[in-house]
Structures are given as C-alpha cells and as structure tokens.
C-alpha cells in the first residue's frame, strides 16, 4: 500500500488502466452469463462504463488506500487487507454499476440481479481486483509498489 501523499500521475494512470480493463472483462461476464443481458446490452453497458471508470478510477484508488489503512489499524494481516479490499470494492462500485445499467436500459429486475450478483461475486472479485491493482501499480512503477533497480 502506498503512503498517503500528493497526487501521483503514475498512480492515477495505473488505477485507471486497472479499473477499465478489470471492469470491462468481469462486467461482461456477469451481465451475459449471470444476469441474462444480451451481448448488445452488455457491450453498451461496458462501452458506457469506460468513461465512468476513467472518472472514478483514481478516486476509487484513494478510497481503497484509505480503507486499507483503516483495516491495517485493526490488523496488519493479509486477511484484513483482503476484507478491506472487498468492502472498498463493494461500497464504491455498486452504486456506479447500478446507474450504468439503468442508463443502458436494463430492466429493474436485471439491475437488481446484476448488482446483487456483483456483490456476491465481489466477495472474490474485490480481492482479485486489489491484487490486479497492486500489480498494475508495480508495472506503472508507482512509488511504494516497486523497488527501483540500483
């Protein structure tokens, strides 16, 4: 986890890349295979989600880092980090996801099913997203996530 500090362009770029890629892939999976949306509805949803994810990626990264710090105050264990990742992901992403589905014309039943399924899947997905985000931050050489070569 990075230290709290000033805005870092590498951090924002890594957070944006991670959110756009991860949410596009996992969102299509949930919408088509679990929620019963058509491919066209899902593609419209995923296309609309790209600018939304670009807009919320860095704020989510800041929120996630805050949640990880709060979890670390309770316990420094990996289990607590995973719980903090899960809580951060579900509480931040669910409202945004519901709005995207509403805009693309999903029925109320599809929205409830998709968001509910997303909450259940997030029990695993939120943790995997945390690992994916950390890997992206390392790849983008975000301070605190990589070791510079001497």
UniProtKB/Swiss-Prot annotation:
UniProt-recorded name of the protein: L-alanine exporter AlaE
Protein's UniProt keywords contain Flavoprotein: no
Keyword terms of this UniProt record: Amino-acid transport, Cell inner membrane, Cell membrane, Membrane, Transmembrane, Transmembrane helix, Transport
Species the sequence originates in: Aliivibrio fischeri (strain ATCC 700601 / ES114)
A GO BP annotation: amino acid export across plasma membrane
A molecular function (GO) term: L-amino acid efflux transmembrane transporter activity
InterPro entries xrefs: Ala_export_AlaE (IPR010574)
Main location: membrane
Family, similarity comment: Belongs to the AlaE exporter family.
Membrane topology category: Multi-pass membrane protein
Lineage of the species this protein comes from: Bacteria, Pseudomonadati, Pseudomonadota, Gammaproteobacteria, Vibrionales
Biological role stated in the UniProt entry: Exports L-alanine.
GO cellular component terms attached to this protein's record: plasma membrane
Residues annotated as transmembrane: 17-37, 48-68, 86-106, 111-131
Domain of life: Bacteria
Compartmental location: Cell inner membrane
């Amino acid at each position: 986890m990075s230290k709290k500090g000033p805005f870092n362009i590498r951090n924002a770029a890594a957070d944006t890349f991670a959110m756009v890629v991860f949410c596009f892939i996992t969102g299509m999976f949930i919408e088509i295979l679990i929620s019963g949306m058509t491919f066209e509805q899902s593609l419209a949803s995923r296309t609309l989600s790209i600018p939304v994810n670009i807009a919320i990626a860095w704020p989510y990264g800041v929120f996630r880092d805050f949640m990880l710090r709060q979890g670390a105050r309770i316990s420094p264990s990996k289990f607590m980090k995973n719980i903090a990742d899960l809580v951060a992901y579900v509480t931040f992403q669910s409202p945004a996801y519901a709005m995207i589905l509403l805009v693309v014309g999903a029925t109320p039943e599809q929205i409830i099913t998709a968001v509910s399924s997303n909450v259940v899947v997030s029990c695993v997905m939120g943790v995997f997203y945390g690992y994916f985000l950390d890997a992206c931050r390392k790849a983008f050489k975000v301070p605190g996530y990589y070791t510079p070569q001497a």
